[in-house]
């Protein structure tokens, strides 16, 4: 007590020093009330800034006031308990309380002086931060810079700063602070009784006080200036707050540190509990000193304030109670120091006791833990301090001191909370911890070092955890507040909170928590929970301070207010707060005030955590949970926190982070949750904070939040590594910039210490529990980011991140992205889990530090997805059974149909939503959509080259265009990349080069008009292609010159050195030759390597010897010389004549067999790939071309085959082309070397390669060069026509119809021009061309929409003239009528009436006649020839029916494949004939029967036509080659050779007859419809006969084809016997007819004249005649006696009574040969026996013409083969027009009776009525001789 008195004597001068904490409280009170300033000038001076903060907060202000006034009563005891590390402090405050009040009284008495002194001193403290008027304060002021480090470390850095202080002057400062805290705190609380307070202080810290007061004395003089005292009072308080008090405590400890420590431990223990309880209960007196200290710190931006603030809840109560007296002046009258000490100790003790109950289970656990661990903690702390560097011990003392002075009032509690915060690190990261990190700074520093030890040890963590929990909660509030306070939060001081990492030191205590955080196990939680529970309780008690805090929250600057609130809550968190305090450095007062009232003020920076912390934001808590588990376990929140393992809720947190991003909600949560709860929540949210930070930066201050965290990352990069998971915290800090700056500032001094401590922490986090530990470390991190409490989730990540904090420094870019990139904001989880490893730029991750958030709570990212899943609507199922479809096609699906010409029809379903009653969501009804027609090119445009192909290549004018096109393609190949699927092939590049080379060779071939030899330019071009790098010395240099390397040339003046020769060998050789043994001499020379001698001798020997010598030379000399002599060796072999063996030099036979042979001679075998010789093919070809030898082309072919065997197709084709003997052929030709250039037809995996347009066009270019340009009139590649048709189809499919039509025309022209039809010119080709042409004509519009787009005579005749011509007889109308009528004539008798039908027949006949082969083709070939057997059974029975249908109408398919059976050859062919596409071709275009079958069927084969046609088609195909040769005038070319007989086999009899009667003109009687053999030219003779018979028919010779002549031949036999009678008869009948006609004309002359125009002449007279019923004069034929039957209205043959039958059914066979022919035709094939074919020579041509479509030529040839049935044939011919319809079944449509042998068309022909007629009548079809005599 003497000391107090002495101190009291000192009070006037030393009050600032001794009563640093008291002065701080007084200063705060002074700030609140000016009068208090005088008394608390010293104390207030130091605490002034905190006082301001407390002033802002009512509770805090009261605490300050209480500190100033009641400090003597409560402040001293509380301060003693809180600050006194040992029981000494606690006891001394009690004993000193009386003195303290007296001291306070004297202080108040000396208030003026004190104020003056404090004013003076305050100036210094204000400048120094914590320096107070007291000398001790001055010492502390000296240390203040260090202390400010602690202040900076108020957050995480606070601990480090405290450590630094302890290590440096801080240690002394802590001692002094400790002493001062003991005394100063007492004084602060008993400011009124400062003497007593100083006495107690003197007892405990006399030595320190002396030193400190001595310092103050030096400063006291200036301090005494009263005016400045008040001003300094406010400023001095901060200086005095932590600076002096800790120094006093430390000084006191210096005197009896051990005792003090124990005393403090007891007091601290009780005081700590008291503080916890008081914080919970908002009891101010004990924490007054701390409270005022925190206020001081807050005002100073000191770090430790926040920690004190949390411990100040009781102090806040004291301050509040003291504040009133202070305001009333009661501060001076406040109880004596003894009273204050008693109250203080009682308060602390009571509070501790109360706190435990208040915490409920946590309180019990906490006190139990503290009871057990109190001493242990203190011992551990002390031990830790002992073990730790002095700095650490000092830190602990400073924590004690700070706890005495500030809410951390009880050093023990602080130390314990320190440990607890460590264990409870997750809570420490909470706002309160981070913010209150400054008081915790001691704890933080201590825990950082010791606590890290402790952190590994679970005991310490529980206490710090609890504190942190509260601090976190308060900080969460603070953080929430910070959003409102964003401007201040932006301040770096909050980054000091980041020094909460110092809390990482507390994680030393955290060891238990880490397991919790990771697993959230109860044990870690217990450890941390025990202390947290009291903390939570105290925080609960300080709920009022929390209210103050909330009140303060709106006032971020006056965080001292919130600090008091938070102090109560923060008291347990104080240790943790120490680190966080640095973050709150920007609002040091706030932090300090957090200590007194609501650490949440400090939490101001932690506000972001609060934002995150809001329990509602479980995700954040979860995110924090991983780290938090340990921390949360400490407080009741711990359990809650532990349930939140960030892992699970972390995912949830990200969504809350948006919620959290708004600071207000989280502040509400912070408020709602007890400091502990919030703290626990906040740790949980810390893990989630990563996500929250993302959002928080947005709602709160994104820049502050994000930036702050990033600063922490930078400054505390070491710790950051752990924070990486809490990467989002940077955004939180960003939202609370003030804390963030603090964090960085704290980092500076204490942050470093913290980091030093943190590494252990980070080391701990390395273990899975690291997350729990990380929560502590992360709590530090969180403290650093506490301001951005919203970084809670990231903080969770911090758990592991602190260790990775250093790693996070790389995340400075994220810091840059503090603006919080939206992506990170949107998906904080991403930042939490993934960012940690990647360390992406902040911009990528948004506000949160991506890496930090990544930590254990990466799961949090999952919730990051903000978009809601799109609603899936159900379909309305049908009720008609479709719902059972497993494919659910009733739901609709796009439909595409690809049509001809590149047309695409598409239809997409429409999904129409339909609503029904009782359903909230609509259901989908699928309906058909719009049908659209588009072009395929619109969707899939074909790759078009720069130059369009000029095809079809018809004339030399195309050369230039073709060269340009080839050049463009070559350039495209050279510039194109190798396809991906070819890149794996080692030869891909080689193959591309060879392909390009092939195209270049073809270009050279085109440029040189198909000649590659004999031209210097061509040779040079080839040389340049094969050897692009070759340098020619002259134009005449050969390709072989390339291989003479200049380096090997000897100088001209160099002496020649002959090879060494063994004279004995030469002598032996000579002796051998003398004996005449040349062969022996040769081999002797070879053995001696005398190659010159051996070759000279062998040159005159057998060639085989020469070849062997050369081969041996090559093997022994050439091959072994170098590795690149394969080409030379091969060339030597070729020169030697070893053609087949030459390729062995390139690739040995063993290699081709798959063996690898090793040469024993040179040993080079295994070192070289035996297949490398293939690459020498170009050199070999060049040598051969430059040095031609007799059989070198064979060598090139062999080389090509070798290359082809190794899939070098293009190289092989180049060799084939250059060899000039390669065989081009179809796929079916086994001898063909090339089918299409660039296509290996021998290894076709599919036919797709044959549809390659490039290959087709390249082959066409080759053909063009070798035929057109070379002057050849004949196509050299007949097989290419089919591929041209394929190309035409492809053009049509791409919509290029005009070009496709051009190709069709070109193919047709080539077929016509061919004099030697090839086997490849088959009916399939004809039908395919015809079909494509017809479809193109149908679908192609020639440009106009008008009905006559292109006026042309052809179309006009087809449309108009055909109608008129249909009534006109004669061949003139056939061409036109054929085209127009063919579609109309369906049945054999369609258009039978009148001569039109007849007239048409002749025209068709002409067409076929013009085609030589057509005439030769037999009827049978017509039908099926094309479809062979199938066509026999073609649907249409009669060829006429099909013929009537246009070729397009025919059944053939549009596919490239040509439908064999779909259409009747006869029918369709006839159509082509009509179209005149294949006038000569019809025999091919249509089964010969088709075109000509019309004639034979018309005669007697009409009934048989269908069958005959089918079989005939088969036969015709058999005879296609025959046809071609028939055109060659080969009478009977084996039809079977080309077309299979099976087609004719259906009519075996016919086939037999065919074989038996091939000579009869190759036409088999209808019976042998099968095989048709081209009629022999003998038919020509008979055709001449027919001509004679029908000499009257001028057109007959024209009409006649070979077939017609054959008909004549057939009729010749009968002609001898019948002609005479027939002629007479016909003459008579003709006379009668003419007479009748004349009479009719006489009767009707006017009508005839009445007709107008020349048409009237045609139609009028004739029609009149016909209409009149009078016969028209016409030559009826020899044997025919026709008369016009008026009843039947037709001409009737008298000799054929059946002809008079009115029915058109097949009339009875005409008498004579006609009936047999008819019956034969009806039988399906004319009986082979028919010796005389009906005179179908002419008639056949006619019927074919009448058929309208060139039926197969078989019709005309048929007559010769149908010797017997000729009458029928003529008949069919006469009905030719009709006949084509039933060519296959002439019986169904019986042909008109044919006049016996006469070629003249009979009346039947003229009438066209189906009547049995004699074959000869067919010849009557001649156009000129027929008159339309049809009677109507």
Swiss-Prot record:
Known role: Involved in the initiation of assembly of the COPII coat required for the formation of transport vesicles from the endoplasmic reticulum (ER) and the selection of cargo molecules. Also involved in autophagy.
Similarity comment: family membership: Belongs to the SEC16 family.
Keywords: Autophagy, Endoplasmic reticulum, ER-Golgi transport, Membrane, Protein transport, Transport
Composition bias type Polar residues, residue spans: 57-74, 123-133, 422-457, 528-546, 590-603, 679-688, 738-747, 845-854, 1428-1439, 1513-1538, 1550-1559
Organism of this sequence: Aspergillus fumigatus (strain ATCC MYA-4609 / CBS 101355 / FGSC A1100 / Af293) (Neosartorya fumigata)
Main localization (coarse): endoplasmic reticulum
Subcellular location: Endoplasmic reticulum membrane
Topology in the lipid bilayer: Peripheral membrane protein
Name of the protein this chain belongs to: COPII coat assembly protein sec16
CDD domains membership: ACE1-Sec16-like
Pro residues compositional bias, start-end: 510-524, 653-665, 1725-1736, 1757-1769
Bias (Basic and acidic residues): 91-118, 137-151, 471-480, 705-721, 1594-1603, 1620-1644
UniProt biased composition (Acidic residues): 257-269, 348-361, 369-383
GO terms for cellular component: endoplasmic reticulum exit site; endoplasmic reticulum membrane; ER to Golgi transport vesicle membrane
Sequence segments annotated as region (Disordered): 1-163, 183-209, 240-269, 345-863, 1420-1482, 1509-1679, 1692-1832
GO biological process: autophagy; Golgi organization; intracellular transport; protein localization to endoplasmic reticulum exit site; protein transport; vesicle-mediated transport
Residue stretches of biased makeup (Low complexity): 622-636, 814-829, 1737-1756
Disulfide bond positions: none
PANTHER family associated with the record: RGPR-RELATED (PTHR13402), SECRETORY 16, ISOFORM I (PTHR13402:SF6)
């Amino acid at each position: 007590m003497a000391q107090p008195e002495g101190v009291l004597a000192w009070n006037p001068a030393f009050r600032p020093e001794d009563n640093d904490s008291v002065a701080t409280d007084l200063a705060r009170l002074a700030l609140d009330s000016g009068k208090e300033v005088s008394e608390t000038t010293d104390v207030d001076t130091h605490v002034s800034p905190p006082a301001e903060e407390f002033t802002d907060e009512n509770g805090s202000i009261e605490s300050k006031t209480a500190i100033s006034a009641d400090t003597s009563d409560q402040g001293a005891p509380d301060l003693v308990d809180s600050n006194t590390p040992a029981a000494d402090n606690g006891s001394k405050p009690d004993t000193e309380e009386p003195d303290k009040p007296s001291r306070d009284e004297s202080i108040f008495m000396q208030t003026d002086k004190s104020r003056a002194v404090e004013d003076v001193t305050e100036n210094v403290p204000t400048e120094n931060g914590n320096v107070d008027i007291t000398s001790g304060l001055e010492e502390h002021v000296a240390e203040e810079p260090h202390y400010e480090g602690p202040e900076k470390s108020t957050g995480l850095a606070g601990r480090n700063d405290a450590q630094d202080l302890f290590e440096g002057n801080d240690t002394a400062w802590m001692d002094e602070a400790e002493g001062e805290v003991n005394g100063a705190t007492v004084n602060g609380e008993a400011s009124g009784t400062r003497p007593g307070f100083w006495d107690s202080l003197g007892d405990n810290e006399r030595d320190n006080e002396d030193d400190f007061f001595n310092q103050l004395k030096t400063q006291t003089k200036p301090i005494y200036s009263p005016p400045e005292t008040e001003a300094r009072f406010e400023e001095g308080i901060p200086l005095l707050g932590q600076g002096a008090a800790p120094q006093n405590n430390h000084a006191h400890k210096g005197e009896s540190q051990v005792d003090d420590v124990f005393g403090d431990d007891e007091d601290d223990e009780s005081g700590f509990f008291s503080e916890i309880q008081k914080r919970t209960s908002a009891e101010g007196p004990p924490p007054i000193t701390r409270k005022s200290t925190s206020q001081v710190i807050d005002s100073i931006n000191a770090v430790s304030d926040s920690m004190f603030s949390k411990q100040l809840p009781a102090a806040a109560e004291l301050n509040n109670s003291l504040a009133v007296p202070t305001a009333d002046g009661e501060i001076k009258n406040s109880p004596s120091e003894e009273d204050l000490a008693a109250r203080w100790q009682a308060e602390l003790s009571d509070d501790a006791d109360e706190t435990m109950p208040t915490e409920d289970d946590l309180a019990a656990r906490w006190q139990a833990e503290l009871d057990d661990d109190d001493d242990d903690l203190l011992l551990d702390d002390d031990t830790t301090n002992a073990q730790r560097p002095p700095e650490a011990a000092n830190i602990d003392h400073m924590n004690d001191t700070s706890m005495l002075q500030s809410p951390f009032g009880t050093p023990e509690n602080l130390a314990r909370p320190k440990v607890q915060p460590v264990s409870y690190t997750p809570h420490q990261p909470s706002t309160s911890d981070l913010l209150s990190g400054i008081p915790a700074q001691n704890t933080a520093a201590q825990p950082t070092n010791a606590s890290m030890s402790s952190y590994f040890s679970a005991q310490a963590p529980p206490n710090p955890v609890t504190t942190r929990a509260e601090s976190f909660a308060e900080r969460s509030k603070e953080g929430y507040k910070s959003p409102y306070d964003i401007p201040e939060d932006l301040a770096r001081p909050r980054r000091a909170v980041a020094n909460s990492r110092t809390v990482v030191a507390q994680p030393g205590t955290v060891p238990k928590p880490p397991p919790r955080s990771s697993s959230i196990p109860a044990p870690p939680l217990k450890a941390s929970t025990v202390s947290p529970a009291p903390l939570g309780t105290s925080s609960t008690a300080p709920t009022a301070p929390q209210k103050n805090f909330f009140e303060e929250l709106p006032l971020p600057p006056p965080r001292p207010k919130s600090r008091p609130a938070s102090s109560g809550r923060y008291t347990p968190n104080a240790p943790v707060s120490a680190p966080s305090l640095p973050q709150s450095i920007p609002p040091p007062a706030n932090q300090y005030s957090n200590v007194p009232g609501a650490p949440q003020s400090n939490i101001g920076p932690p506000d972001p955590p609060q934002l995150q912390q809001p329990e509602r934001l479980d995700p954040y808590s979860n995110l924090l949970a991983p780290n938090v588990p340990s921390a949360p376990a400490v407080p009741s929140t711990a359990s809650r926190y532990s349930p939140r393992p960030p892992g699970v809720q972390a995912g949830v947190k990200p969504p809350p982070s948006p919620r959290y991003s708004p600071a207000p909600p989280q502040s509400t949560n912070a408020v709602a949750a007890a400091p502990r709860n919030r703290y626990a929540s906040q740790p949980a949210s810390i893990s989630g904070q990563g996500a929250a930070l993302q959002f928080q930066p947005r709602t709160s201050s994104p820049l502050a939040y994000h930036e702050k965290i990033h600063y922490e990352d930078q400054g505390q990069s070491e710790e950051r590594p752990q924070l990486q998971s809490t990467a989002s915290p940077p955004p939180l800090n960003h939202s609370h910039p003030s804390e963030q700056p603090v964090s960085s500032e704290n980092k500076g001094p204490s942050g470093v210490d913290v980091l030093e401590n943190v590494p252990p922490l980070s080391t701990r986090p390395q273990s899975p529990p690291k997350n729990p530990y990380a929560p502590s470390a992360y709590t530090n991190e969180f403290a650093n980011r506490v301001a951005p409490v919203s970084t809670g989730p990231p903080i969770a990540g911090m758990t592991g991140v602190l260790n990775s904090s250093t790693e996070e420094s790389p995340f400075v870019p994220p810091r840059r992205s503090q603006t919080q990139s939206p992506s990170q904001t949107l998906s904080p989880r991403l930042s939490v889990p993934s960012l940690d490893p990647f360390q992406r730029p902040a911009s990528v991750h948004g506000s949160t530090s991506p890496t930090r958030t990544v930590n254990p709570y990466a799961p949090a990212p999952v919730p990051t997805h903000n978009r809601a899943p799109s609603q899936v609507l159900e379909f309305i199922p049908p009720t008609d059974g479709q719902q059972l479809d497993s494919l659910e096609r009733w739901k609709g699906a796009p439909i595409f149909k690809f049509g001809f010409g590149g047309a695409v029809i598409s239809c997409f379903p429409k999904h129409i939503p339909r609503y029904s009653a009782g359903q909230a969501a609509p259901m989908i009804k699928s309906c058909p959509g719009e049908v659209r027609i588009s072009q395929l090119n619109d969707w899939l445009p074909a790759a078009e080259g720069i130059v369009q192909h000029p095809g079809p290549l018809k004339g030399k004018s195309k050369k230039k265009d073709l060269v340009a096109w080839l050049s463009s393609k070559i350039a495209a190949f050279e510039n194109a990349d190798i396809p991906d699927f070819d890149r794996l092939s080692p030869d891909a590049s080689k193959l591309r080069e060879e392909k390009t080379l092939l195209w270049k060779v073809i270009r050279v071939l085109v440029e040189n008009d198909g000649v590659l030899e004999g031209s210097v330019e061509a040779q040079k071009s080839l040389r340049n292609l094969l050897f692009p790098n070759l340098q020619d010395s002259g134009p005449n240099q050969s390709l072989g010159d390339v291989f003479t390397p200049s380096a090997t040339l000897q100088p001209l003046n160099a002496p020649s050195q002959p090879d060494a020769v063994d004279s004995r060998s030469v002598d032996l050789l000579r002796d051998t030759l003398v004996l005449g043994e040349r062969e022996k001499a040769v081999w002797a020379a070879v053995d001696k390597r005398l190659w010159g001698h051996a070759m000279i001798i062998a040159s005159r020997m057998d060639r085989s010897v020469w070849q062997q010598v050369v081969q041996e030379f090559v093997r022994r000399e050439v091959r072994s010389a170098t590795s690149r002599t394969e080409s030379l060796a091969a060339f030597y072999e070729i020169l030697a004549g070893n053609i087949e063996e030459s390729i062995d030099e390139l690739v040995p036979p063993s290699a081709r067999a798959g063996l690898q042979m090793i040469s024993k001679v040179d040993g080079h075998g295994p070192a070289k790939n035996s297949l490398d010789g293939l690459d020498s093919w170009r050199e070999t070809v060049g040598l051969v071309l430059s040095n031609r030898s007799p059989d070198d082309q064979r060598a090139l072919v062999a080389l090509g085959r070798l290359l082809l065997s190794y899939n070098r197709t293009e190289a092989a084709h180049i060799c084939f082309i250059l060899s000039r003997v390669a065989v081009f052929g179809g796929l079916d030709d086994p001898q063909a070397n090339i089918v299409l250039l660039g296509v290996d037809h021998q290894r076709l995996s599919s036919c797709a390669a044959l549809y390659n347009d490039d290959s087709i066009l390249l082959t066409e270019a080759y053909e063009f060069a070798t035929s057109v340009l070379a002057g050849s009139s004949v196509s050299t590649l007949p097989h290419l026509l089919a591929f041209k048709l394929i190309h035409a189809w492809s053009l049509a499919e791409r919509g290029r119809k005009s070009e496709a039509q051009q190709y069709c025309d070109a193919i047709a022209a080539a077929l016509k021009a061919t004099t030697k039809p090839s086997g490849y010119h088959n009916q399939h080709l004809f039908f395919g061309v015809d079909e494509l042409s017809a479809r193109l004509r149908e679908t192609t519009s020639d440009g106009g929409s008008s009905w006559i787009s292109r006026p042309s005579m052809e179309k006009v005749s087809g449309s108009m003239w055909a109608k008129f011509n249909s009534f006109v007889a004669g061949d003139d109308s056939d061409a036109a009528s054929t085209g127009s009528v063919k579609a109309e004539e369906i049945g054999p008798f369609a258009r039978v009436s009148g001569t039109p039908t007849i007239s048409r027949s002749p025209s068709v006949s002409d067409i076929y006649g013009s085609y030589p082969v057509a005439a030769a083709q037999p009827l049978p070939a017509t039908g099926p020839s094309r479809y062979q057997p199938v066509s026999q059974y073609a649907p249409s029975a009669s060829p006429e029916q099909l013929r009537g249908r246009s070729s397009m109408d025919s059944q053939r398919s549009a596919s490239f494949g040509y439908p064999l059976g779909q259409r009747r050859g006869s029918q369709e062919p006839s159509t082509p004939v009509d179209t005149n596409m294949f006038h000569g071709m019809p025999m091919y275009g249509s089964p010969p029967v088709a075109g000509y079958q019309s004639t034979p069927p018309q005669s007697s084969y009409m009934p048989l036509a269908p069958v005959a046609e089918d079989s005939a088609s088969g036969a015709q195909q058999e005879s296609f080659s025959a046809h071609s040769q028939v055109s060659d005038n080969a009478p009977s070319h084996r039809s079977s050779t080309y077309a299979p007989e099976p087609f004719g086999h259906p009519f075996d009899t016919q086939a037999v007859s065919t074989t038996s009667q091939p000579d009869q003109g190759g036409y088999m009687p209808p019976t042998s419809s099968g095989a048709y053999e081209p009629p022999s030219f003998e038919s020509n003779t008979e055709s001449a006969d027919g001509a004679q018979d029908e000499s009257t028919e001028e057109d007959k010779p024209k009409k006649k084809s070979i077939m017609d002549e054959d008909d004549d031949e057939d009729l010749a036999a009968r002609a001898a016997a019948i002609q005479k009678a027939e002629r007479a008869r016909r003459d008579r009948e003709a006379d009668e007819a003419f007479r009748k006609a004349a009479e009719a004309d006489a009767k009707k002359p006017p009508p005839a004249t009445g007709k107008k125009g020349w048409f009237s002449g045609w139609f009028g007279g004739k029609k009149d005649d016909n209409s009149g019923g009078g016969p028209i004069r016409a030559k009826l034929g020899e044997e025919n006696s026709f008369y016009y039957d008026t009843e039947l209205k037709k001409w009737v043959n008298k000799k054929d009574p059946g002809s008079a039958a009115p029915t058109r059914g097949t009339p009875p066979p005409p008498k004579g040969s006609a009936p047999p022919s008819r019956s034969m035709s009806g039988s399906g094939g004319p009986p082979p026996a028919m010796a005389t074919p009906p005179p179908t020579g002419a008639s056949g041509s006619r019927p074919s013409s009448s058929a309208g479509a060139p039926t197969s030529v078989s019709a005309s040839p048929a007559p010769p083969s149908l010797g017997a049935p000729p009458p029928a044939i003529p008949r069919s011919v006469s009905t030719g027009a009709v006949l084509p319809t039933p060519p296959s079944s002439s019986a169904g449509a019986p042909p008109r009776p044919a006049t016996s042998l006469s070629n003249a068309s009979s009346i039947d022909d003229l009438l066209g009525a189906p009547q049995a007629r004699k074959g000869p009548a067919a010849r009557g079809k001649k156009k000129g001789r027929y008159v339309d005599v049809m009677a109507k």
